[in-house]
Amino acid sequence: MNEEEKYLFDLRGYLSIENALSECQIRNLNNIWDKHIQDQCAMHETTHRFGQLLGWGQAYVDLIDNPSITPYLEVIIGKQFRLDHIYADLIRAGTSPIGAKLHGGGTPFDPCQFYQFHNGKMFNGLTVVAYNLADVGPEDGGFGCVPGSHKSNVDFPAEWKDMAEVMHPCISKVFGPAGTAVIFTEALTHGALPWTGDGERRTIFFKYSPNSISWSPTYFDENNFKGLTENQRSILEPPNARPPNRKTRPKRESD
């Protein structure tokens, strides 16, 4: 993460990284997704949220520590970040699975979703990596946010939140070709603009937290997944302080 990128993330609360996925990765991820659409998504559904992605195959497991993204997370969150939760959203037309309302923001303070900057270093709570598996054009809809709102000291006006019919001028559209990753802090006021593109919007969301924090009420069990690297197992740990002299991984009190 270079100095220009640090400046932009501090200024706006997000970065857009093109080519975060290779053409081969995009193809493999989409091929797997197609199979799950057939199994889980009815033809008439305009939107659908998929979970349990780490069970979809190695192509999804590899995103745990994507080398194109990890260096950014190490600066934005810290070297001992953990995977908090993941899902994938399909939108064929209209609003997302959770609608078109903006959420998040610097105020009121949320100990799980925050942005701070001290002594030349940024500190973030829950942080999102959103991968485009299909092209998103400037007029298609998709990710929208209020740049700089992660540092706001005033509540976002309630009457500006709903983007279903009108988009307030303070909201920016963030778009990019397939393979683009948008990295943003959950302290940023953001949401999904109604989808009007010709094809489907396919977005994978990998959400990370500092090692000692959890936003999600559930944790990954690293033992449920085969073939994980040692680094991936570490990223799937439940929240804990990770003292440097520990002799074992976290375990339940009854173990």
Predicted regions located by residue number:
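Histidine-centered catalytic micro-motifs
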Residues: 99-107, 146, 189-192, 206
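Residues immediately flanking
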Residues: 104, 133, 185-186, 208
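Double-stranded beta-helix
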Residues: 123-126, 135-193, 213
